[in-house]
From Swiss-Prot:
Species of the source: Enterobacteria phage T4 (Bacteriophage T4)
Gene encoding the protein: y12H
Family matches, as Pfam families: DUF2883
Superkingdom in the source lineage: Viruses
Listed InterPro entries: DUF2883
Protein name: Uncharacterized 8.9 kDa protein in Gp30-rIII intergenic region
Length: 75
């Protein structure tokens, strides 16, 4: 069951290995902030990229909200 906070990862032309690296980074960093991310691959027909969305976010503490800022990388 999806919650209301569906977040899409990806943009046109994003290499699959970069997307996998981003998901791994979110899974690694998330638990230290009380967050759990689960991903499901949802390819869109007719698009040249793959969107990944977070199936579930479980907040262990609601004392703060962390805004994730991905690292800037040259492609």
């Amino acid at each position: 069951m999806l919650n209301n906070n569906v977040v899409y990862l990806g943009y046109p032309g994003l290499p699959p290995n970069k997307l996998e690296g981003l998901m791994l980074e979110l899974r690694t960093v998330g638990p230290s902030f009380g967050l759990e991310f689960r991903f499901q691959d949802t390819p869109r027909r007719g698009k040249n990229y793959t969107q990944m969305h977070i199936l579930k976010q479980r907040f262990k503490t609601r004392a703060f909200v962390m805004h994730y800022k991905p690292r800037k990388e040259k492609f």
